Amino acid sequence: MSALIKKELRLCIHPTVFLFFSFSALVFVPNYPYEVIFFFSALSAYFCCISARENGDLAFTGALPVKKTHIPLARILVTVGMQCIMLALTGILGSVKSAALPAEQQINQAGLSANLALVGNGAATLGAFNLVFFPLFYRSPERIGVPFLLAAAVQFLLVGAFLLLRWSVPLFSETLNGGNADHTAAKAAAMFTGLAVYAAATSLSCFFSMRNFKRVDL
């Protein structure tokens, strides 16, 4: 497994991955729907899969002395690493913003503020993306477009739901909004809830992806 992960890191990581990490700084843009930031992490996974397909990675990897089910698992684990970096950067920069700016400048009129709860929301959207994209992709690894479009649609529906909650539910509009200094425990609970959803959804994604890939004729 470690050899497959090294292969993914050296041969399949697309350069845009590192560019998209910088998009976590969008938390400093006022009145922006910050949950959209995490779409770029999903887009990174798409570009990596496209790059691997165009370079004949599947034929190469299939010829290696590795378990067939480890092939999708390695790709998903590397994607999880990229997504966790994006989540961590967004959380860190959100904390910097929370500490550096006055409270009135931390309220986001377009969605949730850049705080711990945002990390939980982002994790939940990425978990939903993983659960849809990878099992569909590993049914037919040569076809990437439709799985990505469906997964991106689900992710944006969840983003839309979070934006709706921001304006309709006091928990989101009052308790979970604003900087980390206010209602810290509630925001931390929201973050850990989102991370738990991410872990569960991604675990299911691994299971279904490995099951589907077993049936693929290499």
Predicted regions and their residues:
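Hydrophobic alpha-helical transmembrane segments of membrane proteins
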Residues: 1-58, 74-218
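Juxtamembrane/interface alpha-helical elements of multi-pass membrane proteins
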Residues: 60-62
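Alpha-helix N-cap/helix-start motif at helix boundaries, enriched for small hydrophobics
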Residues: 70-72
